[in-house]
Amino acid sequence: SGEVTHKDSSGGGGTIQTGDVQWMTAGSGLVHEEFHSPEFAQAGGLFEMVQLWVNLPAKDKMTQPRYQAITRQDIPRIDMDEGAGHIRVIAGEMGGHLGPAQTFSPVNVWDGELKAQYETTLHVPEGHNTILVVLKGEVVVNESHKVQDSSMVMFAKDDIAIQLQALQDTQFLL
């Protein structure tokens, strides 16, 4: 929630708001800063942001830096049955929906919400590094591990089916 402005030495930048995503590729290098927009600084309010860092493949480390401002309207949303929640596909693919982030590594970033007492099974590509970050709420993973908010779980590369059962309304990244 909130709003943040980004500027960088390659000329990239913009202001993202709740539900938007900034995807920055450092590549051959750049200097950047992130700060509250003047409007948000004046009005105040809650600010929450998650940053994920993905190592570029060796062949792409000297690529030109790039900034992608992705608005929430451009992120495909997959609604679950019975109003159980939804998944937003930021990067990669899910169920035929492609995320708008342009990546160098094969990476899926899914932003999900699952309502209390519902469950879902998410299928990830075999061989991928997979991490679940519970931003808010509480889930049981694969019927055995309780994961609370502000926690993360790393899966074995052969865990291609990940079952989530929400004990509370839960927001997560996978």
Where are these regions (language model features)?
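Long amphipathic alpha-helical segments that form oligomerization/scaffold cores
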Residues: 53-87
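Short, structured patches in soluble enzyme cores that scaffold and shape functional sites
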Residues: 51-58, 71, 89-93, 113-116, ...
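A short glycine-rich, His/Asp/Glu-containing loop-to-beta-strand
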Residues: 1, 76-121
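Short, conserved beta-strand element in jelly-roll/cupin
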Residues: 1-5, 53-56, 109-115, 127-140
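Short acidic-glycine-tyrosine-enriched beta hairpin
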Residues: 7-25, 124-125, 130-133, 138-166
